[in-house]
């Protein structure tokens, strides 16, 4: 916890990209120049009304924003306690929140004169969103994806290929998201002249954590306005799943300076934190450096990154965005582990009560929201970010339950 309370969370990051003691730019010298170029281009673009107007236009007419807030009445009655509200990011074009960020970064890539974009992906949603915007803007697209994730997300792999992207399997390490990110970084260093790296989460070296946050902040801005318009007040609590944490910070950011709104992040506890087979970086990790920033990471006593586990490919990452580490240490947000079994139970309950198939990532937040609702009175409001739809996970769920498709 911070020694002094934070009076304005919007003062972060500082000019060097630090969120308190987290964040920064811990990279090889060969990347300093490209990152400085990117930072300058982004700072210029975000002050340009024509860039903002183009981004807003695409969010409305291409992505389909605003996404609605849906009152899950039957789920709320089944659970008992508070009313559960869902911010429906699953209804966006491509089926998740990821498109909010890829649209922004792809427009920036075009503005910078880049002709090739690369991306890393875990669950495949960021890869699909990157391939989608590349096709729309006429850019070459290469997606790095861990071989383990390719096996459990075959549908999204094929979707990327249908959109014209090249998908490169990564077999090093645990062959999951962190390894895909490593390979994408190597590609960027080699091809920086014509290549733009679209990072899919609020991790990486500055300016990525703030840039990805800013492009996803539309989620929270909309939600805040919708809550005041439809319910006349802000929610009592908000919840979102946290791997790297882009959907979560997108929701959280608009509420950071509202002390009456409690903020909760749902991390992947996998088989249970005590088993060691999890991906709960804040709940069970320690500060370290990963992928160019200082944050909470899952590592051994020597500081070496260890393998993680989650039924959800998108949460199977041994780190977390530095702003989340900062929010945790400051006490502004609470991060809790949700097991595979709890996420699965929430997936089925939401499907049966509301007719909505949530992504396994999002199901962690649904499970957390259910727990929160049971502890609150019936007139309390819990807003859950339903960050993506579950079509991509049907084969994983069926296999886990012994059903052959």
From Swiss-Prot:
Keyword hit for Lyase: yes
Organism: Xanthomonas euvesicatoria pv. vesicatoria (strain 85-10) (Xanthomonas campestris pv. vesicatoria)
Function: The beta subunit is responsible for the synthesis of L-tryptophan from indole and L-serine.
InterPro entries for this protein: Trp_synth_b_CS (IPR006653), Trp_synth_beta (IPR006654), Trp_synth_beta/beta-like (IPR023026), TrpB-like_PALP (IPR001926), TrpB-like_PALP_sf (IPR036052)
Pathway(s) annotated for this protein in UniProt: Amino-acid biosynthesis; L-tryptophan biosynthesis; L-tryptophan from chorismate: step 5/5
Cofactor dependence: pyridoxal 5'-phosphate
EC number: 4.2.1.20
Keyword Amino-acid biosynthesis: yes
Domain of life of the organism encoding this protein: Bacteria
N6-(pyridoxal phosphate)lysine: residues bearing it: 98
Pfam families the UniProt entry points to: PALP
PANTHER family per the UniProt record, alphabetical: TRYPTOPHAN SYNTHASE, TRYPTOPHAN SYNTHASE-RELATED
Catalysed reactions, as listed in the record: (1S,2R)-1-C-(indol-3-yl)glycerol 3-phosphate + L-serine = D-glyceraldehyde 3-phosphate + L-tryptophan + H2O
Key words of the record: Amino-acid biosynthesis, Aromatic amino acid biosynthesis, Lyase, Pyridoxal phosphate, Tryptophan biosynthesis
Matches recorded under Gene3D superfamilies: 3.40.50.1100
GO CC, any one term: cytoplasm
Alphabetical list of CDD domains matching this protein: Trp-synth_B
HAMAP family named in the record: Trp_synth_beta
GO molecular function: tryptophan synthase activity
Subunit structure: Tetramer of two alpha and two beta chains.
Protein name per UniProt: Tryptophan synthase beta chain
Family: Belongs to the TrpB family.
